C-alpha cells in the first residue's frame, strides 16, 4: 500500500496548500516510544509510519500529560489538562454517569466553526452518558463510527480477534454488555467483528474525505485506532506475519491502515493540502509482556509518570510545508489544538488552555514556545498536585507510584507493588544524557553539581506556582455508574447484559 502514496510525494511537494489545510490526526492506543521502526525497533513492520517519519518531522521529545486513555484523549481534543475538566481519577466506564463536559470546546468544534467537515473513526472513551449525551456528535463531530470506549470494556472470551477463528486473549471485563459499534448515535453491531473493524474505519475515512472534497470544504478526521491495545486483533492479511506475535500483527494492521489513509488522500490529489499528525495516548502496557509494547530505553510504561509512560512517538507530515527532519524541541499533545487552530485560521476558545502554538516549529519559522511540562498521576489529587515536572533538559519527580499496567518489567519502581512515594528532595534527571532516568543527580556519592542544585530549585518553584494556580474541576468519575446507561442494541430487552447481542455477519 505504501508504494501507491509515496510515489506521489515528489508531486505533492510542489502543490499549493489549501487554505485551510485538511487535517488527519491519527492516534494509536498503548503504543510505546520504541515500537516503530523509525524509533529504533529492530523488527517492527511499520513501513508506512516510517515513510511518514522520513518525509516529515519526527519528534524525540513529545509528551502526553497523563499516561492513561481517558485523560490523555481529553487533553488531545481540548488542549487542557484533564484535572481542569474533572476527568480523574482513572478512566470512564461503559456505565459512567459522567463524561467530557459539554461546555468544554473540542478541536472538532473549533474546526467545524471554520467550515471543516469533521469525523472520528475508532475509540472515543470520553463518556456515553444519558441518551448518549457525551458522544462525539455532541462534541463537534459531524460523523462518528466507532466504539464509545475501550474494546476490552466488555466480555471478549467469545469474540474472534484473528481470522479465521482465533479467539481473543483473556476474558476482558465481565458483567457488562458486549462492546457496541456506533454510527453516530445508533448501534451498528453489538459486538462488531473485530477482524473487519479497521477496514470499516478506513472506508469511513475515505468517504469523509471524498464528501468533503465534493462539498468544497476541508476535512478534519480524528482516526483513533484501537491498535495496539489489548486484546490485540487484526484482519486477514496480518496474523503471523509481523514477527512480533499478536502485538506485532496488530501494529502491522495499524501501519497498513495508515498506508490506506495516505493512499486515499493521494487518490483525491490532496497530499499537498493535508497535514497528517501521528502520535499515541500513552506508553506501552508492559504487564502484557509479549502482548504489550516497547518503551525502548525509557523507564516503565503506561500508568506511570516515568518517561516510558508519558513520552510518545510523534510525526508531523505535510509535503511542501513541513520540512523532513528530526526535532528535539519540547512538545505535548496539549499543543495540538492551538497549533492546528492556528494553521486552519480558526479562533481559539475563550478559556484557559494548557497547550501552545507549535506552528512556527512545524513550518520551520521558529522554535517551540514550550519550555515546561507538568505530569499528573492517573489518580491525581489537589494535595499532591503534579507528580513530575520537566523544564529544559531536567526532570524532577516529586512523587512516584508504580502501576499494574507496567508490571512484569525488570524495574521494581514500575510495578503496582511500588507504593505512592514522596521524594524530598525530588528525584532529578538530566534527560539529555539519561533519558532512561537511571541516575538521580541528587543521589551522587560525589558533591552535587551546582547546576543540578539550581535546576531542582527552579523545578520546585515551577511546581509550587503551578499547583497554587491550578483548580481541579469536579470529578466526572465521582458521579458514579448506572448500569442502565450501558449501550444496548435492544434497549428494552431482558435479561441484561446478555440480551444486548446484535452481532454483525462474520465472513
From Swiss-Prot:
Binding positions (Ca(2+)): 29-30, 69, 281-282
Lineage per the UniProt record: Eukaryota, Metazoa, Chordata, Craniata, Vertebrata
Protein's name according to its UniProt entry: Arylsulfatase A
Species per Swiss-Prot/TrEMBL record: Bos taurus
Family, per entry: Belongs to the sulfatase family.
One GO term (biological process): lipid metabolic process
Places the protein is found: Endoplasmic reticulum; Lysosome
Active site residues per record: 69, 125
Originating gene: ARSA
Known cofactor(s): Ca(2+)
Gene Ontology cellular-component annotations: endoplasmic reticulum; lysosome
Subunit structure: Homodimer at neutral pH and homooctamer at acidic pH. Exists both as a single chain of 58 kDa (component A) or as a chain of 50 kDa (component B) linked by disulfide bond(s) to a 7 kDa chain (component C). Interacts with SUMF1.
Glycosylated position list: 158, 184, 350
Domain of life from the UniProt record: Eukaryota
Modified residues (3-oxoalanine (Cys)): 69
